[in-house]
Amino acid sequence: MLFIISDDLTYTTLSCYGNTVCHTPNIDRLAETGTLFTKAYCQGTYCGPSRASFMTGYYPHAINAMGYKNPRPEIGNRATWSQHFKNNGYYTARVSKIFHMGVPGGIEEGGHGADDEASWTERFNSPGPEWKAPGTGETLEGNPDGIVPVKGGNTFVVVEADGDDMVHSDGKTAAKAAELIRQPRDKPFFIGVGFVRPHVPFVAPREYYEDFLP
């Protein structure tokens, strides 16, 4: 089983849901051959509670997961989604952000964040430069004249970064996931792959901006 999640991606930005500006060909191909949900709702309005909810199967308020923390102290020895597979003979791996992980801070540090160790056979993090990536950028908040330089933190900044995908967290995540899928093994797998974009900061290789520049 391959589970893929992106961070802060609203359905209204996807071509398969009618967006005519954004280009999402890979997601569109999945939609063409799978199920396209029109009434699926998030149980938590922000990152930590939402992820804790779908990984444990509980409402956020039922396990006191209202912040950015690991739900394990509240669920005790009850199995998470991936842990259920692990307990039944599956190889389970996490690549980057599945449970909560700070963006951009946690990605810059390359740590495990609020991950649940018991849920996985192996865990792989994908550190990246985030807003510090070399390139051209500016801060979008409170900057009507476009003169405020890029600054750190959980802020709306945009960086047209030098280099290719492998400079950044998501490029590393995709490469590691592909490597794990191709590895021969004697048991089935559950691989959770977490991409951190389009969560702020808006950092991507320069080539992805070209179609949208004036």
Predicted features by range, described:
Residues 1-214:
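Formylglycine-dependent sulfatase
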